[in-house]
């Protein structure tokens, strides 16, 4: 007996959320949940509007942005932590989804913080 498509889609999302930092493929998820790759991708996209692996990549990029803004962890280590196959792949995907390479993203964020703090200190002096 096949479960309702929306129930399956939510099971897939829970699985992806729990394993998004690991190397993961659509085939692995489909085998784990005992459905075809095509059906899994179809019901997931129908429910959430994006293909499952794009969902995973967006989760990873969101977490990477957090690491880049809030830590000084090297980019290669962030890529590894988030399950990227290589630093080159991570850089390419980060740029694809944000429009900026990770190093430049971090640098721009730090400059905006410095500029913001400088502006606040100038306001206090007035």
Q: Where on the chain are the PLM-derived regions?
A:
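An amphipathic alpha-helical interaction segment
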Residues: 1-15, 32-41
């Amino acid at each position: 007996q096949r479960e309702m498509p929306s129930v399956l889609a939510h099971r897939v999302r829970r699985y992806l959320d729990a394993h998004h930092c690991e190397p993961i493929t659509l085939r692995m998820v489909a085998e784990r949940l005992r459905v075809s790759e095509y059906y899994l991708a179809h019901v997931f996209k129908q429910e959430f509007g994006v293909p499952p692996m794009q969902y995973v990549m967006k989760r990873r990029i969101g977490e990477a942005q957090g690491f880049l803004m809030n830590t000084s962890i090297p980019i290669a280590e962030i890529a590894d932590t988030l399950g990227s196959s290589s630093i080159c792949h991570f850089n390419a995907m980060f740029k694809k989804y944000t429009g900026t390479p990770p190093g430049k993203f971090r640098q721009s964020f730090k400059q905006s913080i410095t500029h913001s703090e400088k502006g606040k200190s100038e306001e206090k002096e007035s």
